[in-house]
Structures are given as structure tokens and as C-alpha cells.
């Protein structure tokens, strides 16, 4: 199946002034309403990572769950959930981080990973990189390492991919948008 970049991008809906004035939110729900586009997303990630040397897939709450869980299933890898504060029932590790909207906390079960594990992190998009950097910090606190950060969308003007790369975390995104791109 050929990856059609322009058709793919047309299925990501821009929502102006959401969740606050001046922000163009990239809504991926139309992408998931297209079985063909969803298959292209999953197949692209599976092909990238099928021969990669890693042990776990970490998924960011909540839209990272949509992609990473299917990729984990396809690659037969354990899934690690990184959740918003207060959503996990057992002992957790917590990490504060800044988003483009304010401060938040990311949590993971404390027994999710151990030394020697290697994780590919999945989210829907990379904006400031705050969520993925918080997840990387949690991964490292458990003695594991980050293999790569993956997302459907990169917003390079917000600098998240650069911040991740500066921390020696490679990134891979299927597409990117300029902030003013409609």
C-alpha cells in the first residue's frame, strides 16, 4: 500500500482556537474514521520497527494509545501505559512537565520496566515535547532506555523534536505541519 502524504494530511482536521485562542489543534479522529488511512499509519510504524532491537512500547495518554497499542500487538511487544495523574491504581512514579497549555503530571506503574529494557514511545503528535520528555525521564528512572519517540505528526516550530534530539532521543514522525498550515 503506497503512503499518500497529501491524502493522509487532508484527513487531519485543523481546529482553530482550540483548546484556547491562537492554537490550531490537529484533530486525528478523521484519520481513524478511514480504515485505509489507519492501516497506513499502523503499517508504516510496523515496517519501521519490525527488525528494531527494543523490548517495550510505551504509549502516551490518550491518543498515543490508539497507535502504540496496535503496533505493540503487531510486533508482539509488551505495552507500557503512561497516564495522566491519578489514573493508575497501583504504585506509580510521577513526573511533572510543561505543556503548551500549562503544567501537568505523567505517571507510570513503578514496576512497568527494569534495567536493560528499551522502549519506543508513541504519541499522536510532538509539539513542545513535554509529554515525551517526561515519559523518557520516567523510563530512565526505572533503569531502562529510550529507543525512539514516534508520532503521527510533528509541529517543528514548537521545538519538541529538537528538544528530544538534544536529549539523545531520536524521533520519527509520519508527517509535519507548520503552525499556520490549514
From Swiss-Prot:
Return the InterPro entries for the record.
Ade_phspho_trans, Adenine_PRTase, PRibTrfase_dom, PRTase-like
| CDD domains attached to this UniProt entry | PRTases_typeI
Pathway membership, UniProt: Purine metabolism; AMP biosynthesis via salvage pathway; AMP from adenine: step 1/1
Catalyzed reactions per annotation? AMP + diphosphate = 5-phospho-alpha-D-ribose 1-diphosphate + adenine
- Tell me which UniProt keywords the record has, alphabetically: Cytoplasm, Glycosyltransferase, Purine salvage, Transferase
Which Pfam families does the protein's record reference?
Pribosyltran
From the Swiss-Prot or TrEMBL record, state where the protein is found.
Cytoplasm
EC id: 2.4.2.7
Example GO biological process: purine ribonucleoside salvage
Which Gene Ontology terms of cellular component type are present? cytosol
Q: Name one GO molecular function term.
A: adenine phosphoribosyltransferase activity
Q: Which Gene3D superfamilies match?
A: 3.40.50.2020
**Source taxon at top rank:** Bacteria
Instruction: Describe its function.
Output: Catalyzes a salvage reaction resulting in the formation of AMP, that is energically less costly than de novo synthesis.
Q: Which protein family is named in the record?
A: Belongs to the purine/pyrimidine phosphoribosyltransferase family.
Q: How does it assemble?
A: Homodimer.
- The entry's protein name is Adenine phosphoribosyltransferase
Amino acid at each position: 500500500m503506497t503512503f499518500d502524504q497529501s491524502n493522509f494530511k487532508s484527513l487531519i482536521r485543523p481546529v482553530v482556537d482550540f483548546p484556547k485562542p491562537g492554537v490550531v489543534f490537529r484533530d486525528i479522529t478523521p484519520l481513524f474514521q478511514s480504515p485505509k488511512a489507519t492501516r497506513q499509519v499502523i503499517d508504516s510504524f510496523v515496517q519501521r520497527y519490525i527488525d528494531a532491537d527494543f523490548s517495550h512500547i510505551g504509549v502516551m495518554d490518550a491518543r498515543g494509545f490508539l497507535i502504540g497499542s496496535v503496533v505493540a500487538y503487531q510486533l508482539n511487544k509488551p505495552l507500557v501505559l503512561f497516564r495522566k495523574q491519578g489514573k493508575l491504581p497501583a504504585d506509580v512514579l510521577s513526573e511533572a512537565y510543561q505543556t503548551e497549555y500549562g503544567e501537568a503530571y505523567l505517571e507510570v506503574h513503578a514496576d512497568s520496566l527494569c534495567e536493560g529494557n528499551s522502549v519506543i514511545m508513541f504519541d499522536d503528535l510532538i509539539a513542545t515535547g513535554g509529554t515525551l520528555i517526561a515519559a523518557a525521564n520516567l523510563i530512565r528512572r526505572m533503569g531502562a532506555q529510550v529507543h525512539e519517540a514516534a508520532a503521527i505528526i510533528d509541529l517543528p516550530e514548537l521545538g519538541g523534536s529538537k528538544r528530544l534530539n538534544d536529549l539523545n532521543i531520536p524521533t520519527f514522525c509520519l508527517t509535519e505541519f507548520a503552525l499556520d498550515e490549514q
